[in-house]
Amino acid sequence: MMRVPWNDMVYIKRALDIGVMGVVVPYVQNAAEAEAAVAACRFPTEGVRGVAPHAARCSGWGSRIAAYRAAMPQELLVACQIETEEAIDNIEEIAAVDGVDMLFLGPSDISASIGHMLDMKEP
């Protein structure tokens, strides 16, 4: 797994192209952002991930692209990082997005977003 710097299709593609089988996408606030993260992980027509199999380690430099593409929906893990009060308010909708496999809570960032920075005893 790799935590990408931002919910951006270029960062996600780079991580997947080097062969990681899971991404942690930071600062996901709502279902639309979770859907964008999942779409960045999927090839067309299920998503928007770019296709360059001969230039990517993940597909054996093109030699395993069919097998790789077939396995990705089942084997790739997509984790959305929940870090704000807004994300907490939308957590059920984020979790319900098809293709989101895991939610990762950032307790320090959540605490800061509700005005209790570094006070882990508060909600």
Where are these regions (language model features)?
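Expand to "…catalyze enediolate/carbanion chemistry for C-C bond making/breaking, isomerization
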Residues: M1-P123
